[in-house]
Amino acid sequence: NSSRNSGVIHAGLYYSNSPNKEKLCIRGKHLLYDYCREKNIPFQQPGKLVVAQAGEEPLLNSIFERAVANGVPARILSGNEIKSACPDLSCVAALESPSTGIVDTQSLMQSLVIDFEAAGGLLHCRARVLGIDTSADLVQVALDDGTRVTADIVINSAGLNALSLVPSGVEHGYENFFLKGSYFSYASGVPFKTLVYPLPSQGGLGIHLTLDLAGRARFGPDASAVSTLDFAVRPEDGPKFGAAVKQYWPECNVNKLSPDCAGIRPKLKRAGSIVDDFVFLQSHESGGRKVISLLGMDSPGLTSCLAIAEHVFEMT
């Protein structure tokens, strides 16, 4: 859900085993910065530090080498540089990512809607899609109010529900694997002007520090597998968040952490293994009709959004 998003514009550091994410994140980052400048959408480019604790230097170096190979700006900071730039930061090494940014997601989405409607599109909110039928002359989308929308081409980008709307004739073998991520806000200022990330962990990028455009700090998200769509943040998780943050910011006051929001990542499994990449499924029907389904659109989906649109357009 785009409203449950940290608003980070990712540089494209992490996705060595996710070719679609890697390509579309790097391309999307440039498109998104250009779009924000063109449309006067609020954004900043504070950069990011990815920090390593003792024994984690090899993983940090592998991320750096991949970034360099892909033309993503990055450099390893020396111990003295870290102490000079962020004296409150605790780590043995850090990677600086200057092209990481933050964006006002609400303004971005509003601008995209304006563009869509200016091009002749009609936005129909609060309409539950019951199914997609490809058996007729046109693809038919059935809504819960009895309406049927027909088109030659349908783009299924329904997030957590996208897999359930893939036409029945498409064999794919994917199943949903939902990962919930919660955020905690911090009640006062933090001594950092850049985003701070630990090294990636299973299921996500670790409990990291993000800043909004007003400088307010949030920590998260964590990652826990869920079977139901529960968006409540558990206050009792505060100590867990505090312990994670204290690894790189020892002076964090756990008492200043409070539940903020939660989101659920629409990840996928196939043959029992997690598929950590964007997936594009296409249903080819007679007469040029088709349904294109966008699956597994979690992070870096926001960063990649305009590049994803380019890719889908090429598929049509």
Name each region found by the language model.
Residues S16-R27, V51-L59, E96-I114, A232-D237, ...:
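Short beta-strand to alpha-helix junction loop
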Residues C305-T316:
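Internal hydrophobic alpha-helix adjacent to the cofactor/substrate pocket in enzyme cavities
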